[in-house]
Amino acid sequence: EPVGSPFIHVMLANIPPEIGLDTLRHGLDAWEKYTGVRPAAGWNPECGWASFLPELYREAGFQSLVMDADSFFLSFPEIREATGLSYDVQGHSNKNHLFKIEEYIRDKPEFLRYLTNPSAAPNGLNMIFRSDCMANPMLWYLMGATEGMRSEPVSPGEIRAMLENWKSRIAASGSFIMPYAEDAEYIGTSAYFYVKQFNQARFFEPEPSSVARFRELLDTATSLGYELSTPSEVIENAGPPIENDLIEQIENGVAWHGGTAKAWANTEYSRLLDPVCRSIFDGIALLQKRTGGRKELDDALKALTSAWVSDSRWPPLPTSPGRFNVRETLDDLYRANGFLEKAMEKAGIRELRALYSPELMRTQIRCIEENLMSRKYFGEV
């Protein structure tokens, strides 16, 4: 089953909802254009959270959304206290400590049921929860890497034991589990694994053995009696979803892996780029009101959305984004500003620079360009 997402990998919780809605629809349009299928299930990049997201996905046309269970569980004071986990916008994540959540809820059906049943947001959007308590060991298994204190990689036997443990939990509390919902690029490459886990400048190295290991995951699951299913199938077969208004207690600005979406908004790159993005967005909104819908304004919105991509703002110190990521965002800002200039010309309001000044904005983009391009980026020698 295809799973839709924003066309541009943006942190939806950190940008104007209007931008988020447009790129969600753009993503669905792209799926339909190239495959003939319009996804019903949705993915939220990095599972960043804000209260408006269920409404955003519903308005875009999604019927269901994959949710992060760890940030949901950490919204319960008793789980936060039992695990000792906390959030900090300067922290990278709690990824390798989220097993503490599993240790606390493993014999508590009142919590397990959110992992083993679909639930419904107050607006009717169906939700399926994923957790690092299963996904993280599986990721380390796929990479064949060692985990901090470990001397040996995660073994097939450990994966089998984990799946066996969850069989009884599913039977006691629901009907399914979503064990692995992670970045797809880890199946075939190392993606940013070594950057995130070891602060090493190793990007997207080929990992062909991870493909074979992924097959082993599937074979192990089916040998234990698991049946493979899609998000829409488990929702259809599970009966009435749990009415879940507790999602309104998830902290604004958190994300998956026990991290925060606000970490992306608090890097030095975001602090330079985001005010410029916001100024251009305000210009688009003002010109839309003044001139009505124009193609140039939609082009500007698409270019601005691309400029808000998460990868030009992340990862935080001691690493950094890639120079090419930041360069692309700067180019997108120049393009968005150029489209606004054309929109004003075609509307005959070029001289009304109290509305928006493309000339002045061009110098502002150049100012941050000089700052950002003069830096040394992670991995550069």
Task: Give the ranges of each region predicted by the language model.
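Short, well-structured secondary-structure segments
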Residues: 1-16, 23, 40-44, 63-68, ...
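Gly/Ser/Thr-rich loops at beta-strand to alpha-helix junctions
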Residues: 41-51, 185-186
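Short, charged, surface-exposed secondary-structure boundary motifs
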Residues: 12-15, 73-82, 137-139
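Catalytic or ion-translocation cores adjacent to nucleophile or general acid/base/metal-coordination motifs
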Residues: 64-91
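Active-site and substrate-binding clefts of carbohydrate-active enzymes
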Residues: 83-89, 93-137, 143-150, 154-381
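Beta-rich nucleic-acid/ligand-interaction surfaces
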Residues: 46-53, 72-76, 237-240
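Hydrophobic, small-residue-rich alpha-helical packing segments that form membrane-like cores
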Residues: 55-59
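CE4/NodB-like, metal-dependent polysaccharide N-deacetylase domain
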Residues: 20-46, 118, 166-171, 176-180
